[in-house]
UniProtKB/Swiss-Prot annotation:
Protein name (database record): PhoH-like protein
Main subcellular location: cytoplasm
Binding site for ATP: G137, P138, A139, G140, T141, G142, K143, T144
CC terms in the record's Gene Ontology section: cytosol
High-level lineage: Bacteria, Bacillati, Bacillota, Bacilli, Bacillales
UniProt xrefs under PANTHER family: PHOH-LIKE PROTEIN, PROTEIN PHOH
Gene giving rise to this polypeptide: phoH
Sorted UniProt keywords: ATP-binding, Cytoplasm, Nucleotide-binding
Family as reported in the entry's similarity comment: Belongs to the PhoH family.
Listed GO MF terms: ATP binding
Compartment(s): Cytoplasm
Coiled coil: none
Short name of any one Pfam family annotated for the protein: PhoH
Organism field: Bacillus subtilis (strain 168)
Length: 319
């Protein structure tokens, strides 16, 4: 193998830039070495690569793309590097860079929220384009989080008056009346992921204030019956655990000026044996209807710990 001096368009300007690009203790470079079968050596702000010409070219483009993002003030994470490597191997780095061009909104700490994968980009675009969107895929793909982010963004911009978040309490058989405690105590354990997303985007205090004013409503699916939801962003989470009747009931609540986002994972159905999933039925029945988007995410869109994607892939192969 031939040692190359990696020829970048611009040299690294300072140690801080090098740290952002290389990762803590060169962790990002180690990921590249492993995935691209290279040896990468750094001397100050200069990079040397030992590997074949093809791998060298991939690494050159990869580091150039990451550096371009860093110079735009975007903080690079391990997940970003892993996804960038995949895109570089497919010669699709221009799409990787373009994902970071649009900020959806900022979280409670003022940090920019952006899509992290091409699948997420398609999902967010669908939510902008259509009033009814299904986000279907495994855990960790950002289905629920991005739906909440878009809902908050719509509320901040005055496009809607209310956010409604719901999910079936299938673990309790939707029979919450048989559980001890008041409604909030009964419902909260099943809706915790929705609270977590809201707290990240709005902060816990702001979320509570909006809930007290009725601007944000979090409730079990059974409480949607008989309502028409106008000027609202309505999110149904864990939709794989609805029955077809529950799904129909929910979808027909859609009112004027509203959007509905339905998220779920058809591989994680917890319904009693023999009961069909409302999400699985809707996925087939509503496919191709104008104004409805069916977005399917997969393990390449997982934005949790890198091992999560590998675990999902292993189980998918088994099934």
């Amino acid at each position: 193998m031939t040692e190359h001096l990696l020829a970048m368009n611009q040299k690294l300007k300072n140690p801080d830039e090098a740290l952002s690009l290389f990762g803590n203790q060169d962790s990002f470079l180690k990921l590249m070495e492993k995935d691209l079968n290279l040896n990468i050596i750094t001397r100050g702000e200069t990079i040397y690569v030992s590997g074949d010409d093809e791998s060298f070219q991939i690494a050159d483009r990869l580091l150039g793309s990451l550096l371009a993002l860093i110079r735009k003030g975007i903080e690079i994470s391990e997940r970003d590097v892993i996804y960038a490597i995949k895109m570089a191997k497919k010669n699709e780095l221009e799409y990787f860079e373009s994902m970071y061009e649009e900020e959806i909104t900022k979280n409670a700490k003022g940090k920019s929220i952006r899509v992290k994968t091409m699948g997420q980009r398609e999902y967010v675009a669908a939510m902008k384009r259509n009033d009814l969107v299904f986000g279907i895929g495994p855990a960790g793909t950002g289905k629920t989080y991005l739906a909440v982010v878009k809902a908050v963004h719509a509320l901040k911009n005055g496009h809607i008056k209310k956010i409604i978040l719901t999910r079936p309490a299938v673990e309790a058989g939707e029979s919450l009346g048989f559980l001890p405690g008041d409604l909030k105590e009964k419902v909260d354990p099943y809706l915790r992921p929705l609270y977590d997303a809201l707290h990240d985007v709005l902060g816990a205090d702001h979320t509570e204030r909006l809930m007290e004013r009725g601007i944000i409503e979090i409730a079990p699916l059974a409480y949607m019956r008989g309502r028409t939801l106008d000027d609202a962003y309505v999110i149904l989470d864990e939709a794989q655990n609805t029955t077809p009747a529950q799904m129909k009931m929910f979808l027909t609540r859609l009112g004027f000026g509203s959007k509905m986002i339905i998220t779920g994972d058809v591989s994680q159905i917890d319904l009693p044996k023999g009961v069909k999933s409302g999400l699985a039925v809707a996925k087939e029945m509503l496919k191709g209807i104008d104004g409805i988007s069916m977005i399917e995410l997969d393990q390449t869109d997982v934005v949790r710990h890198p091992l999560v994607a590998k675990i999902i892939e292993a189980y998918d192969k088994q099934n």
